[in-house]
Structure formats: C-alpha cells, structure tokens
Amino acid sequence: MIIRSSEPEVKILVDRDPIKTSFEEWARPGHFSRTIAKGPDTTTWIWNLHADAHDFDSHTSDLEEISRKVFSAHFGQLSIIFLWLSGMYFHGARFSNYEAWLSDPTHIGPSAQVVWPIVGQEILNGDVGGGFRGIQITSGFFQIWRASGITSELQLYCTAIGALVFAALMLFAGWFHYHKAAPKLAWFQDVESMLNHHLAGLLGLGSLSWAGHQVHVSLPINQFLNAGVDPKEIPLPHEFILNRDLLAQLYPSFSEGATPLFTLNWSKYAEFLTFRGGLDPVTGGLWLTDIAHHHLAIAILFLIAGHMYRTNWGIGHDLKEILEAHKGPFTGQGHKGLYEILTTSWHAQLSLNLAMLGSLTIVVAHHMYSMPPYPYLATDYGTQLSLFTHHMWIGAFLIVGAAAHAAIFMVRDYDPTTRYNDLLDRVLRHRDAIISHLNWVCIFLGFHSFGLYIHNDTMSALGRPQDMFSDTAIQLQPVFAQWIQNTHALAPGSTAPGATTGTSLTWGGVDLVAVGGKVALLPIPLGTADFLVHHIHAFTIHVTLLILLKGVLFARSSRLIPDKANLGFRFPCDGPGRGGTCQVSAWDHVFLGLFWMYNAISVVIFHFSWKMQSDVWGSISEQGVVTHITGGNFAQSSITINGWLRDFLWAQASQVIQSYGSSLSAYGLFFLGAHFVWAFSLMFLFSGRGYWQELIESIVWAHNKLKVAPATQPRALSIVQGRAVGVTHYLLGGIATTWAFFLARIIAVG
C-alpha cells in the first residue's frame, strides 16, 4: 500500500537567470553555430544561416535547452499574431467603411483599404456601395466584428491598441522565460498538468468567456441590429454587462440570474440558449443563440476534461498507464513505449499535432460554407470562396508538415535499440506491404478516375452523348453520399427530436435561405459529375499520402540505402560512385509530396468554386425563382476534361484577363506576375548545379578582369537548395495565380 502525504509536493520547475541577455551576441550573424559564426567564405554561408537559424536541434543536443528555445519562440510567434491582428483591426478603424456596411450589409461591400493616388493606381478603388471607394476585402472580418457586437470604429481602435499591448507582453514573455525564469525539462514533460491546464484553461475557460461575451454582448446588440436599429442608438457593450435590467428587457429570464443553471432548471434559458439548427433568415448565418449554447456546452465539457488527469494528488488518469494498457488483438504489446517517444521527441509530438490541426483546418473549410457562422457571411460570395480556399491550403500545408516532422523524428530521435516490437517497430517491419498496397490503390484510383473522364471526352468528341457517364445517360450516382445527406435531412423530429431543422441546409429538404435577393444556402444536389471528381480527389490524396508515408517509413533505411539514417534528413545523393541514389532523402519526399498536395487542393478548390456558382450561389426573384451564376452547368460540363478547361478555366478567366482598365486590374497584374513566378520555378527545378557553377565561374572571371570581384566566393545553389527555391516559387506562383483568378471572377459576378 502506498502512503501519500496529504500535502501536495512542491516542485521547483524553473531555473533563474540561466542565460544572460547579450545584444553583442545577437548582433553576430550565426552566433548559434561555430561554423557559421566564422563569417562567409562563399555565398553558401547565407543559405546555411537561414537553414539552421531555427533548427534548434543543430545548435545543441540538450533537450532542455531545445525545449526552452521552442517555448520562447512560441511567444515570439504569438507576438507576431497579435501584431497582425492589431493591423487588421486598425485598418477596420482607420480605412474602412465598417459603420456604413453595418447599416446596410446587403447592398454595401466590405472595404478596409483605400489606395493612395501616387502613380495613378487610384483606379483600384472601386465603388463598393454607399458612396465609398476602396478595395473590396474578402477576409470575413466585418462579419466577425458584427457577430461579436462591435458597432463603431472607435471600438475597433481600442481593440487594435489592446492587441498591440498583448503583442508587447508576448515579446516580453518570450525573453523572460528564456533569460530570467526558464522552465526545467520536467515541466515540459509533465503531460498531465499540461492537459489539465490546456483543456480547462485554454479550451474550457476560453469557450466559457466567449459564451459569456456572446450572451451578454453579442446577442442583445445583434438583436437590435437585426431589427434595424441604428448602431449609434444601441447601448454600448459595457452597459449590457453592468446593467442586468437592460438584458432582462430583451430576455426576461435574465432577471433570475444564475439560479436556473445551478438548480438544473435549464429550460428557463431557452430564449437565449437555443437548439434550432438551420440558418437565421435575416442574416443567413447560424442562429447566434445556437452558437452561444454550443460554446457554453463545450466549455462545461472541457472544464470537466481539464480535471481528469493525475498531477500532485493521487487521483485521475495517468497517460503512460492509459497508453500501456491499450492493447488490441493484433498489436502485441500495444502502445507500450509511445509515451517515451512523445515526451522526448518534440518532432514526434509536433507531427501528431500538425496532422490533427491540418485535418481540423480542412474540416473548418467545409463548415464555413455549409454552416456559415457569421451574419451576412453566406451572401458574401467572395469571402466564402476565399475562406474555403484559404483553409484548404493551410490545412494541406500542415498535413505535409506532419509528414516532414515525422521523418525528422525517424532520422534524429528514433532509437532502434530500445524500440523493439512496439507498435512503431511493427509498422516499420511491414512497411513494404503498406507501401506496395498503397501504390496499388493509387494506380487503381488513377486509371479508373481518369479513365471515366477520358471515356466521356472520347464519346463527346465522337458525338455520342448517349454513351457518356452523366445524369442524363449512363448514371453513376453517388448513392452513399446521397444516403448520408438524406439521413441528416430526416434527422430533425426523428433521431434528433429536439432540433427544429437539420444541422445544415446542404443536406436536402425544401428549405432555401436568401438574404437581400441573394441565395445564402440551399440543398446541394450531388450527381454523376460529383461522383467523378470525388474519385479524382481520392486519387490525388492517396498519391500525396503514398509519397509522404514512403518518406517517413524509409527515412532511416531502405534496400537501396541501408545506412540512410547516417546521411541525415536531407542529402542530395548517396555520394559519388553510387548511381540512382538521388532524391531518396526524407526531405526529398516532402519536396515531392508538396507538388501532389498542390494537385490535390487545386482540384478541390476548383470543384468547390464551380459547384457553388453552378448549383448554390445566385439571385432569387420576387416569385422565388433562383438564377444561379453559371446556370447549373456543372452537372453536364464538368464530366469531361474538355468541359473543365472550356467552361471553368477559360470561361471564368475572362474577368481576370479583361480586368485592365477597371478596379479589378490589380488582379490582372497579379495573374500575370504569379504566372511568371511559377514559370521561374521551372528554371530551378529543371537545371543542374554544374550548369550554373560553370556560368558563375565565367562571370567571376569577368569580374576579376575588371578588379571588382567580391571577397565572398559566389557558389551555385546546392541540389537541395535549388529544389527548395523551386518548390517555393512553384507553390507561391500557383497559389497567387489561383487567388487572382478566383477573386477577379467572384467580385465581378458575385
């Protein structure tokens, strides 16, 4: 029997003044590395400086010191985020038409940027309505501000200043927790305490405070705004907070205070904590009362979750015990050993977090249109398209990052001597089966999905529409997807007896929400065209996964290079004299994976953009007749590759190509410039190092002749550097091209 002292033990978890603050050291480029600190001999030095500045593993092998650097860097990151937010709010306060938009969001477009007339570029200030001229923004900030109850530009100023104060505070915290009071390694590895604090503090109290803000500030202010009250007449947020009678006039049960909460008489709160489902017909957004209810429920769940883990007192879950008890029938000793991996390798931990956060970000992308959370968001088509595209790209990059850090973990932190027969070892031992099967799946999906399109193009070209796969000829209906849609559409009143409408209008039914003559959302029909493109999605996702997973599973060794772990995370080839060993490093798999990620997400956002313009977005007449932007052409046009090129890319590029001389002309310039950036990448991807070194030496000779040669020797980019520059410009150029194409189109027609 274990006798525990009733007093919790006090652990000393910080070191005082571990590292002195030295501006002299910070001013010395490369101070973190003995080699780089010597200064440049060749131009490769500047590349190494950038490559290693944040690679804390390369500065020291002391896990505590690495942990402190990462922790401190997080505060720096938060500081930048607050600075960015402050800038957004400041633009809203200083350069925007927010107050005008608030008074008439259906006829006035959001703008928070006015171009100064320096060389005639004031043409970019288009008329967004209400007599305001500026650049139309598509970030969704106006909708968020309205939902949170901001009614004046003064409030935006105050928030911007508050964010600046927080940015300064975060910078200070980053310095303080590295130089003055740095946590010990034990603190970083105390997972139970971390879970309790993050669950109860960040998620629990965070959700609770947001729910409180929504109930006490957002709901009353939005109720007045929806009723058409002038924003200047509405009481200020602090008046609602300090004066309960004001709220009780809107929601009578407020006079009872918190009594119903603690006496479990919750139905008293039903007027401001609802369970309606569907969208508010006035704003086209989710009911704010539903959102407040959701955040209160989430807060309570997370507050409970934040008390589940064992810390100083002898009760609660212990993560190591949970993991080691987790055994399946086929997994041998189960999760034994995983705890040690995740508390000693931050790359392994980061990999999991990136995979989950990336997946979550993609889930957010899909919810932003199917359950639009903010007022007047659903009818702002430019913002809807931007939010979807943005979250898809971000989520995909995070998922590729997960593979990158999993591979770095395998190379740098994995210890095969202690990892015998645990789950990871078992996966590694049958990696050939995993990769070869996944490869087969990719080949199957590729030939079949592409084959369906090729069939349709051929039949269409030969004038045989009756032999095509389409909703009007040979149907390939997505029956499983339609079944799921139907199940959700029928849920209210049956499996979800408390809800009045379904979670999303997209599931089906007869409901349609339109705001100011524009469609906010309606049931989205799925047919043969969606079936075809979904299999392209499956194909591109599986190929991306194949490349990334192969990189992780073969990061340490392969039949081709058994000693790969000794070569490190990134290397060009396995030395001279071994042909056919280039592009095998874990880094190269990330590099190649990025291109397929780009393929995958491009198809997704093209599908979304066209589908919404064809089947959802549009105007509605007095008689209730809906006219879609592209007139429902998705179902018949997107079933051939020619249709994608002709009726999507070419037809919808007309706005960006013809934008010169209009307020959208900046998008035309970006469209052109981003194509150039993309093409520039090919120069790095298609040419070798030797070619450039030869050219450089000839140019250096000319400089020597003229006695203007630099002391630092010019060097061609290494193979890996060239690829890094190439993929960066490829992605940057491709994404910026798509951005210009989408926005010029949707701002012109939406």
From Swiss-Prot:
This is Photosystem I P700 chlorophyll a apoprotein A1. Chlorophyll a' binds at H675. PsaA and PsaB bind P700, the primary electron donor of photosystem I (PSI), as well as the electron acceptors A0, A1 and FX. PSI is a plastocyanin-ferredoxin oxidoreductase, converting photonic excitation into a charge separation, which transfers an electron from the donor P700 chlorophyll pair to the spectroscopically characterized acceptors A0, A1, FX, FA and FB in turn. Oxidized P700 is reduced on the lumenal side of the thylakoid membrane by plastocyanin. GO terms for biological process: photosynthesis. Keywords: 4Fe-4S, Chlorophyll, Chloroplast, Chromophore, Electron transport, Iron, Iron-sulfur, Magnesium, Membrane, Metal-binding, Oxidoreductase, Photosynthesis, Photosystem I, Plastid, Thylakoid, Transmembrane, Transmembrane helix, Transport. The chain crosses the membrane at residues 70-93, 156-179, 195-219, 291-309, 346-369, 385-411, 433-455, 531-549, 589-610, 664-686, 724-744. Phylloquinone binds at W692. The keyword Methyltransferase does not apply. Belongs to the PsaA/PsaB family. Its main location: plastid. It is found in: Plastid, Chloroplast thylakoid membrane. Chlorophyll a binds at M683, Y691.
